[in-house]
């Protein structure tokens, strides 16, 4: 089960941190089908086939490993554009601890007591989708996702807009 919220970041300069301070990976993904979603992804030098059910904030997700040869074979059969992006992974606790003005983005105490740690996955799209910046936060459960108060710098919450699903972006003309 994947439970996530997605945000549209307008300007990387508005972020309260420097992305260069965090690790990143190069992603390439393509879609064999968009309803249901069947995706292939190259994540640095790892390869995956993913199935995602319908949904916006909550979806079933299954990942299967692929080898490079299988990935390249399936890539030739992809529909639409092949999406390329750089993904930065940023621990949200680190941001809220370092920037007192961001304290309002913290989880409520009952979630902190459960040991919930959240990570921001910031995608910087390349090619004809640039300059698009999307941030995703994956949550352990629906209650945590719904109660999370996003800081202003995350921008517009586009979780419920299918336009910002990568599967939709792959089909845009």
What is the predicted role of each segment?
Residues 1-173:
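Phosphate-end processing signature that detects enzymes handling 5′-triphosphorylated RNA
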């Amino acid at each position: 089960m994947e439970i996530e919220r997605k945000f549209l970041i307008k300007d990387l300069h508005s972020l309260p941190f420097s992305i260069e301070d965090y690790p990143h990976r190069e992603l390439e993904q393509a879609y064999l089908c968009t309803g249901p979603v069947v995706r292939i992804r190259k994540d640095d030098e790892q390869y995956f086939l993913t199935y995602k059910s319908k949904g916006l904030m909550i979806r079933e997700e299954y990942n299967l490993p692929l080898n490079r040869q299988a990935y390249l074979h399936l890539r030739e059969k992809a529909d639409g554009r092949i999406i390329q992006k750089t993904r930065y992974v940023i621990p949200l606790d680190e941001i809220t601890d370092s920037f007192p003005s961001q304290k309002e983005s913290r989880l409520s105490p009952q979630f902190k007591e459960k040991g919930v740690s959240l990570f921001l996955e910031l995608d910087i799209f390349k090619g004809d989708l640039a300059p698009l910046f999307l941030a995703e936060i994956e949550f352990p459960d629906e209650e945590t996702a719904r109660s999370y108060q996003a800081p202003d710098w995350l921008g517009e919450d586009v979780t419920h807009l299918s336009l910002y699903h990568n599967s939709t972006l792959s089909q845009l003309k």
